[in-house]
């Protein structure tokens, strides 16, 4: 396994694979079983698998956890080697965004909804780094997890709109035995908070069932759901149901749909979603 840290090196190490299919797994590090499942899925689709590890400053707003985001490069590289990764790419912020870098991306109004409503730089900052990563690696395909479904949907839109010929694959959400969607930020939680967070997946399934049973009661179901989350000790960022294919609001509930939530528990922001098909 090769470990490279700048664009010249990553291009040099990948040059012999010009005629092979290159698959990119973009991450911010602090790898867990969810990331490794993306690696294993990508190995089914690509001849060469490259994992990028980069805590992207563009997607963090002032006061967020950029500085304290967990970084454990040595352990991450060991996990990648065990998973059969071919190349690990660990660029620096200075290398990705040198002095004078000023380009931005605005993918449109949906970047300011759901996670983008409260995290003003989040979606568009991710889009910049994903464009750079696929251009730097000449990837043929990339994989993102279903847990970040808004990002997955908008990345596909971006690549389609700009004629970027990279397939964006969807990896399944990996959950703990109790149903909690895995996240690197779980390191911020105490054991008691982890136990409390285990409530969320079952709650989402319950909301989904209520919507299926009463499609005309959408507003009331969501309002009750927010109240329930608050009663359970969560600070609610959003609880919403959207059209699965467009992410638009629905005046009348219909399938396929997706229920999204984002909540705060202590200092940790947790997101999840479920498909209603």
UniProtKB/Swiss-Prot annotation:
Summarize where ATP binds, as residue positions.
Answer: 28-35, 145-148, 174, 182-185
Q: What is its main location?
A: cytoplasm
Q: Which residues form the active site?
A: 35 (proton donor)
Catalytic activity reported: (R)-pantoate + beta-alanine + ATP = (R)-pantothenate + AMP + diphosphate + H(+)
GO MF terms here are: ATP binding; pantoate-beta-alanine ligase activity
| Biological or metabolic pathway of the protein | Cofactor biosynthesis; (R)-pantothenate biosynthesis; (R)-pantothenate from (R)-pantoate and beta-alanine: step 1/1
Q: What is this protein called?
A: Pantothenate synthetase
Q: Origin organism of this chain?
A: Anaplasma marginale (strain St. Maries)
């Amino acid at each position: 396994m090769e470990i490279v840290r700048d664009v010249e090196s990553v291009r040099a190490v990948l040059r012999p694979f010009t005629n092979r299919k290159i698959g990119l797994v973009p991450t911010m590090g602090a790898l867990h079983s969810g990331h490794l499942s993306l690696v294993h899925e990508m190995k089914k689709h690509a001849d060469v698998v490259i994992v990028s590890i980069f805590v992207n400053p563009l997607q963090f707003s002032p006061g967020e956890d950029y500085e304290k985001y967990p970084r454990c490069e040595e352990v991450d590289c060991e996990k990648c080697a065990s998973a059969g990764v071919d190349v690990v790419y660990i660029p620096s912020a200075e290398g990705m965004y040198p002095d004078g870098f000023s380009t931005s991306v605005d993918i449109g109004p949906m970047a300011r909804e759901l996670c983008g409503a409260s995290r003003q730089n989040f979606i568009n900052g991710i889009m910049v780094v994903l464009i750079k990563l696929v251009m730097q690696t000449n990837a043929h395909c990339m994989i993102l997890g279903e847990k970040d479904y808004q990002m997955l949907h908008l990345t596909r839109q971006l690549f389609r709109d700009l004629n970027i010929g990279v397939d964006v694959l969807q990896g399944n959400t990996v959950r703990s035995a109790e149903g909690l969607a895995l996240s690197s930020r779980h390191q911020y939680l105490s054991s008691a908070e982890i136990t409390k967070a285990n409530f969320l997946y079952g709650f989402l399934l319950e909301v989904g069932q209520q919507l299926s049973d009463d499609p005309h009661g959408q507003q009331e179901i969501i309002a009750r759901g927010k109240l329930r989350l608050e009663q359970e000790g969560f600070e609610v960022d959003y609880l919403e149901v959207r059209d699965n294919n467009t992410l638009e609001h629905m005046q009348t509930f219909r399938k396929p749909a997706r229920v999204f939530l984002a909540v705060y528990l202590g200092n940790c922001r947790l997101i999840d979603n479920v498909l209603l098909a």
